[in-house]
Amino acid sequence: GAYQISPGLDTYVDGTGWGASSWGSGTFGSSSAIGSNNQLRLWSMDSFGEDLIACPRGGSIYYWDYTNASTRAIALADLAGANLAPTLGLQVLISDVDRHVVILGADPINATASGRTGAIDPLLVAFSDQENAAEWEPLSTNTAGSLRCSAGSQIIGGLRARQETLIWTDVALYSLQFIGAPLTFGLTLINEGISLIGPNAPVNTPTGIFWMDKKGFYAYQGSVQPIPCSVHSYVFDDLNEGQAFQVFGFLNKQFNEVGWFYCSGSS
């Protein structure tokens, strides 16, 4: 049947080869590329005023206009007045100060500054001009720009917190903070040697940020602290690490607790 956006998969794919893609595709013994269409589909989205910006992990970035509620979302790069807007990303969110659109793992501007490369830079953090989702060209007359995480090989996820945005790579935790002109944002390494088990694993609560890594639970209240856990072995000895990106953290306000849904070893 016809569709506008590929639905993706409901399981995470570690590698490709036998059993990947459609029957008969590729030659015997060859691998196939993992794209957003044949990978676990994880959407991120955030409100930009009354509008919505959304992005399937590793896919295109979309903008939905609330005032035209009967129309479909369009690609961010097709937005009226769009200038060098990213075409791909791992996650989208809005900054806590000044309403900048932030794309984690955006495709960078090409060498001639005539467009985007169309290839994700997994450590790049790109941000738009203040309160302007269409303007992404870094100029002295605006506040658009980009920063790159130095530790790790890819950004796992990010979460807006109080006066900062936390960004996890596969080996480190960073803090993205608004610092004003001329740099707009500063990216500070908080802790190296920890990570995030999946993009939806962090939880924002009134008392701090909590998240699950592949070997433990952590809290952040200005510094990183491990959380003692009486069921640590029960959870991590029976964790399906191959489906780590399906982990989902949640806040239960009624009982003042946080928790995580995860795939067990037999699932």
Feature annotation, model-predicted:
Residues 59-60, 107-111, 216-218, 265-267:
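Short glycine/acidic-enriched loop and turn motifs that connect beta-strands
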Residues 150-267:
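Beta-sheet-dominated scaffold domains
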